[in-house]
Amino acid sequence: WLFSTNHKDIGTLYFIFGAWSGMVGMSLSMLIRAELNQPGSLIGDDQIYNVIVTAHAFVMIFFMVMPILIGGFGNWLVPLMLGAPDMAFPRMNNMSFWFLPPSLSLLLASSLVESGAGTGWTLYPPLASGIAHAGASVDLAIFSLHLAGVSSILGAVNFISTIINMKPINMSPERIPLFVWSVGITALLLLLSLPVLAGAITMLLTDRNLNTSFFDPAGGGDPILYQHLFWFFGHPEVYILILPGFGMISHIICHESGKKEAFGNLGMIFAMLAIGLLGFVVWAHHMFTVGMDVDTRAYFTSATMIIAVPTGIKIFSWLATMYGSQLTYSAPCLWALGFVFLFTVGGLTGVVLANSSIDIVLHDTYYVVAHFHYVLSMGAVFAIMAGFIQWYPLFTGLSLNPKWLKIQFSIMFLGVNLTFFPQHFLGLAGMPRRYSDYPDAYTAWNVISSIGSMISFVAVLMFIFIMWESMSSNRQVLFPTQTSNSIEWFQNIPPAEHSYAELPTISY
């Protein structure tokens, strides 16, 4: 296990690591909602509150969503869907995983020394500078990010090599499964954006420790430069988080609809490519309040709205794939339908925020929090749940209890919506982000939001119980539920240690 070069074992390690980190991240979010449940202070001052918020973001993004979607599902499914015997660089694959536990350890250490890194996950100077955050906390967080970044870059190189070099000779680009496409595009985005983040946080590190002035106006630097560099990474990053989810949802909807391919398969591929490309030219929409020229704001507003077009193509293609089919309303199907609906809601609030003039008012309010939690907590997480339930029988050879899964879906659906829908109202009413206290006019919606978070917590506990029950009762799977449109279901269930002794013949 520790030194395994098998893509299945490494994928399983990623799943276990992601689940553990997810529990840490969820605990942090419960602390946030407990603090905000009533006006007045519960935990302490805003420094400790901001440390919790910062750690919650980092843990959920870098140690939960990315390891599960890219590391877990990517490692497990890409070689199986390509008919490849393993990844292109199996030992580097192992190293990619083992960079993550030290990275997480450094991040958790940053919260425990001095007074913690209370900067928000963006690490903006001058708040993250040596003066405002003296001590080792921010430095530890920066090293943690470096390690996570190296891990992701190595993984990205590995996936790109695998997808280009290890597919069957007659698998033309439009025949490559959509999930493999999505992971390939994700890997490309990682490869192009992470070095910029590494440069930005390295400059921040030297500003803090080696007396440089990249972001210090007193020495001729500019803190806005940091924001440009960070968001040039930060915006592609949010597409990195959702693209593998897009690929998985495409497969699940095809599978559940009994169709042989998605509606507009080529259009789906080009939509993902367009999203990946456009993701790099919209970064300053995170900075509408820093005083950019009006023509710059106009460009970033327009470019951001253009991203809604390929995203809309994907959503309507999913709907068209389901059209006319007899849906079974199985658990993966429910998660996929929930994904399509809630991701659309999150996308619509994104179009609202894309308007630079409106964003001046809504920037740094709970409206933004509601927007990105709809696309992450109900986009990425719903995709993870859908994919996990869909492929769990393939990975383990065991079956989950379908009735309990539907009940668990209902509880989770209620919980996340109750948590994040009221935050739109809080944002429109002007409640700012990253404060541990608020005027009592905001109490009602915050109470509802906190109740929703507790319901979600119960739903997650129930899911852990469903998995435990499945493994302890050991119900073997006899055959897949439906004839499938992708080749991973032709494996034994669970697959053999080495799936392909020779390259399979793919005939269409």
Curated annotation (Swiss-Prot):
Its main location: mitochondrion. CDD domains: Cyt_c_Oxidase_I. One of its GO terms (molecular function) is cytochrome-c oxidase activity. GO terms for cellular component: mitochondrial inner membrane; respiratory chain complex IV. Its cofactor is heme; Cu cation. Mg(2+) binds at H363, D364. It comes from the Eukaryota. Heme a3 binds at H371. Ca(2+) binds at E35, G40. It catalyses: 4 Fe(II)-[cytochrome c] + O2 + 8 H(+)(in) = 4 Fe(III)-[cytochrome c] + 2 H2O + 4 H(+)(out). Its EC number is 7.1.1.9. Fe(II)-heme a binds at H56, H373. There is a cross-link at H235-Y239 (1'-histidyl-3'-tyrosine (His-Tyr)). Residues 36-45, 113-135, 208-222, 282-293, 353-365, 429-441 are mitochondrial intermembrane. The chain crosses the membrane at residues 7-35, 46-81, 90-112, 136-165, 178-207, 223-256, 265-281, 294-322, 331-352, 366-395, 402-428, 442-473. O2 binds at Y239. Cu cation binds at H235, H285, H286. InterPro entries: Cyt_c_oxase-like_su1_dom, Cyt_c_oxase-like_su1_sf, Cyt_C_Oxase_1, Cyt_c_Oxase_su1_BS, Cyt_c_oxase_su1_dom. Pathway: Energy metabolism; oxidative phosphorylation. Expressed in all tissues examined. Highest levels in gut and fat body, lower levels in ovary and collateral glands. Residues 1-6, 82-89, 166-177, 257-264, 323-330, 396-401, 474-508 are mitochondrial matrix. It is found in: Mitochondrion inner membrane. Component of the cytochrome c oxidase, the last enzyme in the mitochondrial electron transport chain which drives oxidative phosphorylation. The respiratory chain contains 3 multisubunit complexes succinate dehydrogenase (complex II, CII), ubiquinol-cytochrome c oxidoreductase (cytochrome b-c1 complex, complex III, CIII) and cytochrome c oxidase (complex IV, CIV), that cooperate to transfer electrons derived from NADH and succinate to molecular oxygen, creating an electrochemical gradient over the inner membrane that drives transmembrane transport and the ATP synthase. Component of the cytochrome c oxidase (complex IV, CIV), a multisubunit enzyme composed of a catalytic core of 3 subunits and several supernumerary subunits. The complex exists as a monomer or a dimer and forms supercomplexes (SCs) in the inner mitochondrial membrane with ubiquinol-cytochrome c oxidoreductase (cytochrome b-c1 complex, complex III, CIII). This is Cytochrome c oxidase subunit 1. It comes from Blattella germanica (German cockroach). The lineage of its organism: Eukaryota, Metazoa, Ecdysozoa, Arthropoda, Hexapoda.
